[in-house]
């Protein structure tokens, strides 16, 4: 089973990676569940130095069944034990793997007894276990994700080891093999055992707990009374653990205490103590293998994801340099093979590749990549220490050198403790035995305590002697401290190497010997003026590790760098640069090759064009390089021809061979002479008089050979460009054909409208409202002229179908030429068979003399066979605001959808042809007016330059030629590729819409065949014709409600007819010259009431309501006894009835019709009934109105007269009432009050009374103007 490493990492580290192109291949070595050789451990006794150790073997006792073998191949990675490790530990390498162990004091008699023994883990163990989890829970991915979350929480120290055991046991309930297999990753002293009753026994250092798999809290049990030595399978630990040493203190940011005195002991923690609470933690060793990167500086636990992270980081960093990545894999593979051979030989074999050599090779491979090399150094800490010791470089000397390729960290310019870098911290042993503890937070800016001993404490040799000489030479402690400050700011990359030399020149300038040694030590050269910081070179690939998708956005092309990103230093910036230059926003391009959208990727034809251009460019570079070398050597040859023989013998060339570039000529010669190029170049420099003519002849010969090849390639490239140019521009054609075939399927068209219908139903149910009424689809027929072209193509294909009967062909012809134009308010087509008479042959049967025709009908049948001779839709063609109504089944619906798509695509091609005609005319007009050139249609520049073949079709004939090509494609006279190429030549990138024209027409013909042959389809057509005679299939929109009863009857009949399939309501609406087709899927499922009595009552109610004669004799009798009408209304009704009777007697029916012609009415008032209460509710925005056209004019004319008469009647009533009820004194007081007089306490004001006329009536208008109110003091 092959595995991608990033698959294992992505659930936990999804936010840390941006994108890994392709699969992250595993390292090429055989996957093994367990190491074949016994693991080798180290024990440190109290009498030993930390750099030495005793090696001994322990027979492994692994549970092989818990870790099934996998056949996948993976690279070296961490197999980390998830433990609560909170104090630094000594690291000692051995062979190919580093096993970390803590030594505790023990009696001298048994130095080995009491040592913590544990197994060696590899990344293969962890990945195999994950494989088993995936396989076991393949249908439950959440379980796998929960397991990774548990591991992530443990890594962040959110839970302790017992908590992990409890959660894993609960998660893998019912899978004892997985629970037991987790023992492989537990620290010594912990063990899980599954009982038969689903109880889980957990052995911890000092106690045994039982955990039921249903999640009950652990129950402590007495510890075992017989201490036993733990095996590699994490056997139970002794009841009394060994005393623990105190936490080691960090003496330097990158150093780790290797050993502490055994006399200092602290009691162990309880087994279930939190890992965060006390400073002293229980002893939990950590197992590290090759490829391990534990973050030990912050005392964080280790897990195998770190190794996978590191592998992915390397591959991302060297994406453009796959050779480096492959070389790295080869180094690890070779080292692992050597270690395997050494183990199998049992100590009789000495590995050819040691850890130091592995580190040195990787260091050369990852030069200038400080972070990668530093992190790799964590996997080989002793090799790293050996390299550092071999260099014998003090810490501050390393800072001076600014060598970022090693693992030495620079001091920080703050008083805070050094934090781990982005890629992990680094571990380095002190070269001597033990170091007294120092402060954890060194104040690095305080340089007053700096001394030569501090500077050279970890180094020796000439570097230490140099600092001693500098201190003695400067004599002043302050000057020496300032010198050290210069080194510190250089170490922080605040200044460059050249600036450092300038800063220390006042100190060392007086001592040339020291100054020269210092510059040589820095690698400083006088000619180097511009320098690239190693830190910047080391972080070239950091951009690949930033997750830009989660960063702040500015538009679609820019992302803001995270605040945690460390900006590179720049010493050349001025304050103005810092103010105006951008350090936050970075460009975030979206490459077409990396895009997940198919439409944005390059097509195969674009790739062909690009490949041609790449090949052309590459050959041009070869030719121009060769030509440049020829010119240089020709100049040298001319120069030599003017020299004497002695001068020629003395003449020499430099590395540029007489030119200006060394690289160009060297590449040209290497291309020809390959491995012998170095000898040729050496001969040209030392003896040009002999070598130049020979090399020049060879170069010219190659020039002719390559020029000839270029001419041959130009023909090939031109053919490929001509073949793929138009196809490369068409980025939609490839996907369009495949997708359009799916869209045109009957099932897709039905699913489209059914999904819209279901969405409406669900929305109405959620909102607890009625289902909205209206069409589900609205389609447009923009040009009626296209209907003729569509009908011609369809009939053309129908005639050539031998499976369709003669009568059915004629019915289809009538539908396309008569019925469809009537529905769409277009002019009918001609049924004459002129085309058939011209194309088809007449076969005379000699025996009977009968006339036969192939693939068609033998002439137009008599008029009696016409299906659509006279329809009401014909009369609506020239009118506006009209509609046609047609209830159809599935076949008719699919046909109308396909027909609309066909008309739409024909219209787009026709419109494009018209646009190209206009562009051609404008171009000719411009050439004639501006350039004074008058050219023919076929005299385009491309044709004259023979870059394009002249076309047989003029631009004006593009659309007719397109229709002819469609007919030829339907007949099989041309293939689809030729058809598509011709379309691209005519319509360029707009031609893709017609690529599936043949499939579309074939689908239409299949539906037409069903329409004329299927029984239900024929009945649908017959029902339309029958209801058309009754006036129920359309008319004017403003009189639609007058036909509502007829249309409802038509709908009920259609629903009954199509009870077994969908029923669609098609409305063809013509408004302002545009034809719109609306389609509504009707709900034909009848809701049967549970109570038959209620159903009967509802039916009776509807019938009585719809009946015009709703007044029963009983109701009339009841109303006569107890009238509920106003007498005046009864009088008006009787008067109208008498007037109607009188008109009928006088026979004035003609005048009545004439009177009704001058009336405008709208009957669109709608109402709904609530089934529960029979309550009628009017629909919003529905209304009725009726008025005579002369009523408004008559109202204007009589308005004044009527207004005066009404006012006089009202005024007479008011005067009469006032005379009876209002005395004169009250009327006088009212007049005074209106004028602001007569009453005290009124606000001072001035009132005026003016007489105005409003609506032909005189009125009094009072205006009040208030004065200022003065208050008494």
Swiss-Prot record:
Residue ranges, compositional bias (Polar residues): 252-266, 284-297, 412-425
Stretch list, region Disordered: 1-23, 87-110, 205-297, 398-446, 1136-1156
Record region (Interaction with NCOR1): 523-850
Keywords: Acetylation, Biological rhythms, Coiled coil, Disease variant, Dwarfism, Intellectual disability, Isopeptide bond, Nucleus, Phosphoprotein, Repeat, Repressor, Transcription, Transcription regulation, Ubl conjugation
PANTHER family: PAIRED AMPHIPATHIC HELIX PROTEIN SIN3A (PTHR12346:SF2), SIN3B-RELATED (PTHR12346)
Name of the protein in question: Paired amphipathic helix protein Sin3a
Domain of life: Eukaryota
Basic and acidic residues: compositionally biased ranges: 1138-1156
């Amino acid at each position: 089973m092959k595995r991608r490493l990033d698959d294992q990492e992505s659930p936990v580290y999804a936010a840390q990676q941006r994108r890994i192109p392709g699969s992250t291949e595993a390292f090429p070595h055989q996957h093994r569940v367990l190491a074949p050789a016994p693991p080798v451990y180290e024990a440190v006794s109290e009498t030993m130095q930390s750099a030495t150790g005793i090696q001994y073997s322990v027979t492994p006792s692994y549970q092989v069944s818990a870790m099934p073998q996998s056949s996948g191949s993976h690279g070296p990675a961490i197999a980390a034990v998830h433990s609560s490790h909170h104090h630094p530990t000594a690291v000692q390498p051995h062979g190919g793997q580093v096993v970390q162990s803590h030594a505790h004091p023990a009696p001298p008699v048994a130095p080995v007894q009491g040592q913590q023994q544990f197994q060696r883990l590899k990344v293969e163990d962890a990945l195999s276990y994950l494989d088993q989890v995936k396989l076991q829970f393949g249908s439950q991915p959440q379980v796998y994700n929960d397991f990774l979350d548990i591991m992530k929480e443990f890594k962040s120290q959110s839970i302790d080891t017992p908590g992990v055991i409890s959660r894993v046991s609960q998660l893998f309930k019912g899978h004892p093999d997985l629970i037991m297999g987790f023992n492989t990753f537990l620290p010594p002293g912990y063990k899980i055992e599954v009982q038969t009753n689903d109880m889980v026994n957990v052995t911890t250092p000092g106690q045994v707990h039982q955990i039921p798999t249903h999640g009950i809290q652990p129950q402590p049990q007495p510890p075992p009374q017989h201490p036993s030595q733990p095996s590699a399978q994490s056997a139970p630990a002794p009841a009394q653990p060994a005393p623990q040493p105190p936490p080691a203190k960090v003496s330097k940011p990158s150093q780790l205490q290797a050993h502490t005195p055994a006399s200092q002991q602290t009691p162990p923690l309880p087994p279930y103590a939190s890992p965060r609470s006390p400073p002293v933690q229980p002893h939990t060793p950590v197992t590290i293998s090759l490829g391990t990167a534990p973050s030990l500086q912050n005392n964080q636990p280790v897990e195998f994801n770190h190794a996978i992270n590191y592998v992915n980081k390397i591959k991302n960093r060297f994406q453009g340099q796959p050779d480096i990545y492959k070389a790295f894999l080869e180094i690890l593979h070779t080292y692992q093979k050597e270690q395997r051979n050494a183990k199998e030989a049992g100590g009789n074999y000495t590995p050819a590749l040691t850890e130091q050599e592995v580190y040195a090779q990787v260091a050369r491979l990852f030069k200038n990549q400080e972070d990668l090399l530093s992190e790799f150094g964590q996997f080989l800490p002793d090799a790293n220490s050996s390299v550092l010791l071999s260099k014998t470089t003090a810490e501050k000397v390393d800072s001076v050198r600014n060598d970022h390729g090693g693992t030495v960290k620079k001091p920080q310019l703050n008083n805070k403790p050094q934090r781990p870098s982005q890629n992990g911290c680094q571990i380095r042993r002190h070269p001597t035995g033990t170091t007294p503890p120092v402060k954890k937070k060194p104040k690095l800016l305080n340089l007053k305590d700096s001394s030569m001993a501090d500077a050279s404490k970890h180094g020796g040799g000439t570097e230490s002697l140099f600092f001693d000489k500098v201190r003695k030479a400067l004599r002043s402690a302050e000057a020496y401290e300032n010198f050290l400050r210069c080194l510190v700011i250089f170490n922080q990359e605040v200044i460059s190497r050249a600036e450092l030399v300038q800063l220390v020149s006042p100190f060392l300038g007086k001592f040339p010997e020291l100054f020269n040694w210092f510059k040589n030590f820095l690698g400083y050269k006088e000619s180097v003026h511009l320098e690239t910081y190693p830190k910047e070179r080391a972080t070239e690939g950091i951009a690949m590790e930033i997750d830009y998708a989660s960063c702040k956005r500015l538009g679609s092309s820019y992302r803001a760098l995270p605040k945690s990103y460390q900006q590179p230093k720049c010493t050349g910036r001025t304050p103005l640069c810092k103010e105006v230059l951008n350090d936050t926003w970075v460009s975030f391009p979206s490459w077409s090759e990396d895009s997940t959208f198919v439409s944005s990727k390059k097509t195969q034809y674009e790739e062909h064009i690009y490949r041609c251009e790449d090949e052309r460019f590459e050959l041009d570079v070869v030719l121009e390089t060769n030509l440049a070398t020829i010119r240089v050597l020709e100049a040298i040859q001319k120069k030599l021809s003017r020299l004497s023989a002695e001068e020629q013998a003395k003449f020499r060339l430099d590395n540029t061979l007489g030119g200006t570039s060394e690289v160009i000529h060297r590449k040209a010669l290497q291309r020809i002479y390959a491995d012998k190029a170095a000898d040729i170049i050496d001969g040209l420099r030392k003896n040009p008089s002999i070598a130049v003519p020979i090399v020049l002849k060879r170069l010219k010969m190659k020039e002719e050979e390559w020029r000839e090849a270029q001419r041959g390639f130009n023909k090939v490239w031109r053919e490929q460009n001509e073949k793929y140019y138009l196809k490369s521009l068409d980025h939609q054609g490839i996907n369009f054909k495949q997708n359009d075939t799916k869209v045109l399927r009957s099932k897709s068209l039905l699913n489209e409208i059914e999904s819209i219908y279901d969405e409406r139903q669900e929305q109405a149910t959620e909102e607890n409202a009625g289902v909205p009424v209206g069409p589900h689809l609205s389609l447009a027929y923009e040009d009626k002229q296209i209907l003729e072209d569509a009908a011609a193509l369809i009939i053309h294909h129908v005639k050539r179908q031998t499976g369709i009967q003669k009568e059915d062909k004629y019915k289809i012809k009538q539908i396309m030429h008569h019925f469809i134009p009537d529905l769409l308010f277009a002019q009918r087509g001609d049924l004459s068979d002129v085309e058939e008479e011209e194309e088809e042959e007449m076969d005379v049967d000699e025996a009977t003399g009968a006339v036969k025709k192939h693939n068609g009908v033998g002439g137009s049948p008599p008029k009696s066979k016409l299906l659509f001779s006279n329809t009401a839709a014909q009369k609506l063609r020239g009118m506006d605001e009209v509609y046609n109504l047609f209830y159809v089944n599935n076949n008719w619906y699919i046909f109308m959808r396909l027909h609309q798509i066909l008309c739409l695509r024909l219209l787009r091609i026709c419109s494009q042809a018209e646009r190209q005609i206009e562009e051609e005319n404008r171009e000719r007009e411009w050439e004639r007016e501006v350039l004074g050139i008058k050219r023919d249609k076929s005299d385009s520049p491309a044709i004259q330059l023979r870059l394009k073949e002249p076309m047989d079709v003029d631009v004006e004939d593009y659309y007719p030629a397109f229709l002819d090509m469609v007919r030829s494609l339907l007949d099989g006279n041309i293939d689809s590729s030729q058809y598509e190429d011709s379309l691209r030549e005519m319509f360029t990138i707009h031609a893709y819409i017609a690529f599936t024209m043949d499939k579309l027409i074939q689908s239409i013909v299949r539906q037409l065949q069903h329409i004329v042959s299927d029984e239900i389809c024929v009945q649908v057509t017959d029902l339309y014709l029958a209801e058309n005679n009754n006036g129920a299939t359309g008319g004017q929109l403003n009189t639609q409600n007058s036909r509502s009863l007829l249309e409802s009857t038509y709908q009920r009949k259609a629903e009954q007819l199509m009870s077994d399939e969908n029923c669609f309501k098609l409305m063809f609406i013509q408004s302002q010259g545009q034809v719109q087709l609306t389609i509504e899927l009707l709900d034909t499922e009848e809701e049967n009431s549970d109570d038959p009595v209620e159903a009967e009552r509802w039916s009776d109610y509807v019938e009585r309501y719809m009946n015009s004669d709703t007044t029963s004799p009983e109701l009339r009798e009841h109303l006569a006894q107890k009238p509920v009408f106003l007498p005046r209304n009864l009088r008006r009704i009787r008067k109208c009835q008498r007037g109607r009777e009188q008109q009928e007697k006088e026979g004035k029916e003609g005048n009545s019709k004439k009177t009704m012609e001058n009336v405008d009415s709208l009957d669109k008032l709608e109402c709904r009934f609530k089934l529960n209460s029979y309550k009628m509710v009017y629909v919003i925005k529905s209304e009725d109105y009726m008025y005579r056209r002369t009523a408004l004019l008559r109202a204007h004319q009589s308005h004044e007269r009527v207004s005066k008469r009404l006012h006089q009647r009202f005024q007479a009533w008011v005067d009469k009432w006032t005379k009876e009820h209002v005395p004169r004194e009250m009327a006088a007081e009212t007049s005074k009050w209106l004028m602001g007089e007569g009453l005290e306490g009124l606000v001072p004001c001035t009132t005026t009374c003016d007489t105005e006329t409003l609506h032909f009536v005189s009125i009094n208008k009072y205006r009040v103007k208030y004065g200022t109110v003065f208050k008494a003091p």
